[in-house]
Design a protein with these regions (language model features):
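Long, domain-scale functional regions
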Residues: 3, 8-313
Length: 313
């Protein structure tokens, strides 16, 4: 999970770093600002019944990107398919294309007419969601975990999400993954006939693999982002010092970016502390909503779990 980025670009007292856009800029102010380490003070109240602090959920700040605060929910909303399909399409394992993914339609607005999953999380409703091969479904209830009100919905930015693919993941570090995610490489000529894209404009998605990689402490972790050598002491240092490992609790959770190995392959964060590629999209794993805020201000709190930052709505 390590990075070739210089450690001098970090503020260790605050567990903040400048990622220098994966090393593509030398500007001191040109990169994204990220929280890293085992337990940074990056907790924030969000999805509140009344702002700034009444009946809120705990979320965590990944960092600041293009001037917008990027948040991830501090916990899964349940385990569901990233996508699934009928048996004749990719053997029922789904299509790794976020712009039409089943879970994307659960998380975002304007899919109310879909009989399964359609905007249920965004509208705090219950119904059925996909959770297995061959369009298998399960009941799902977001009445207490979904987006609570119009005030919160207006705080969520429409943002251009990047998910360029990569096939040489075993040799890549966090900064290299970040650059590839912002690239245009996609799965070429898929047998399912669905054109793949490398960007999507919308409100709610899933964390990037690079987010997970950059969340560790590079002074203690030098492995690459997909290292699976569990006999290596450094491997344990990576997971032990990565706050994003804990947002899923004991649940493996889905990431945003597909991979280049097969038509149904998507990246997964594994609770042992590393990432797995080529996981079938139809499998049911944790879903952790991730989003960007409009121009919100953190106006109180210190970011600790007991005194989270509060947003001025």
């Amino acid at each position: 999970m390590g990075s070739e980025m210089c450690i001098r670009d970090s503020a260790t007292s605050e567990s903040l770093m400048n990622d220098r856009l994966g090393g593509t800029t030398s500007s001191l102010d040109g990169g994204n600002i990220r929280y890293y380490g085992a337990s940074p003070k990056n907790y924030v109240y969000f999805n509140c019944e009344t702002y700034p602090s009444t009946n809120c959920e705990l979320w965590r700040i990944i960092g600041v990107f293009d001037g917008k605060i990027k948040l991830i929910r501090n916990g899964s909303i349940g385990s569901y398919s990233w996508d699934t399909s009928v048996a004749r399409i990719n053997s029922g394992f789904g299509i790794a294309e976020w712009s039409q993914a089943d879970i994307m339609k659960v998380l975002n607005p304007n899919y109310d007419s879909d009989s399964v999953g359609g905007s249920l999380y965004y509208n705090s409703k219950s119904g059925n969601c996909y959770n297995g091969q061959n369009n298998a479904t399960i009941s799902c209830d977001f009445t207490s975990t979904g987006i609570k009100n119009e005030i919160t919905k207006k705080m969520i930015a429409n943002f251009t999400w990047n998910f360029g693919m990569y096939s040489d993941s075993s040799d890549l570090y966090s900064n290299q993954i970040y650059v590839k995610e912002r690239g245009t490489n996609v799965f070429a000529n898929p047998s399912d006939g669905i054109t793949r894209t490398s960007t999507w404009n919308g409100k709610i998605a899933l964390p990037h693999p690079s987010d997970y990689g950059y969340a560790t402490d590079f002074l203690k972790c030098t492995d690459n982002i997909f290292d699976v050598d569990e006999t290596d002491k450094t491997f344990y240092n990576c997971g032990a010092n990565d706050w994003m490992l804990r947002v899923g609790g004991t649940t493996d959770y889905w990431l945003l970016v597909p991979n280049n190995y097969h038509e149904s392959g998507v990246n997964l964060a594994y609770v042992s502390g590393y990432l797995i590629n080529a996981t079938k999209a139809s499998y049911a794993y944790g879903i952790i909503p991730t989003l960007y805020l409009e121009d919100q201000i953190l106006h109180s709190g210190d970011g600790s779990q007991s005194n989270p930052y509060q947003l001025k709505a």
